[in-house]
Amino acid sequence: MNEDLIAEIQALSAIGSEEKFSEIIRLLKNSTLELRGKKNPDLQLSASALVFKKHKLFFIEHPYQKELLLPAGHVELGEKPLETAIREFHEETGFSASESGKLVDVNLINIPYNKIKNEKEHQHIDFRFLLELKEKEAGLAELPFFLLDRTEAPDEFKKYYQYKR
C-alpha cells in the first residue's frame, strides 16, 4: 500500500539514521488504513519544506503549538509528499518554490492533543524536502513567517543548514 513511500525512505537510509528509518518503514508496512487526508486518526502523513533565502531558512509560527516550525502540512488524498511540501510552503508563506525537490529527511513526530480541533494525540510521518525559492516577493501568507539563520533556529532544525547554497 505504501511501497512508493517506503522506496523513498530506503534511498535515504543509505546515508544515515537507519534505526529511525527502519521504524518508519515498519509503521508504513503495517498500516492498513490510508495515511493521506487525515483518514487514520493514529498515524498520518505530512510534508515539510526546507527553503533558504540568502542563507536563512523559512519558519512559520504554528497556530496551535505556538512554536517555530518548518512550513508543512498534511498530505491530501491523491497527493505526493513533495506536492504537499510545495503547496504548504506557498500557502503558509506566500512565496513559491520550485516544483522539484530533494528528500533530505523523514521523521516520526508525536502530535499532542489539540483541544481547538478536538483531535486526539497521534503521530505524523513527516517527509522533509529541500526546495528552491522561485519568487523573490511574497503573495498573501496564511501564517507569520520568519527567516532565521542557524544561530536563531530551533535546535531540531540546525542540522538542515548544511543544505544552504
From Swiss-Prot:
Keywords: Folate biosynthesis, Hydrolase, Magnesium, Metal-binding, One-carbon metabolism. Pfam families: NUDIX. A motif (Nudix box) lies at residues 73-94. Its cofactor is Mg(2+). Gene3D superfamilies: Nucleoside Triphosphate Pyrophosphohydrolase. GO terms for biological process: folic acid biosynthetic process; one-carbon metabolic process; tetrahydrofolate biosynthetic process. The keyword Oxidoreductase does not apply. Its EC number is 3.6.1.-. Disulfide bonds: none annotated. One of its GO terms (molecular function) is hydrolase activity. Belongs to the Nudix hydrolase family. This is Probable DHNTP pyrophosphohydrolase. The lineage of its organism: Bacteria, Bacillati, Bacillota, Bacilli, Lactobacillales.
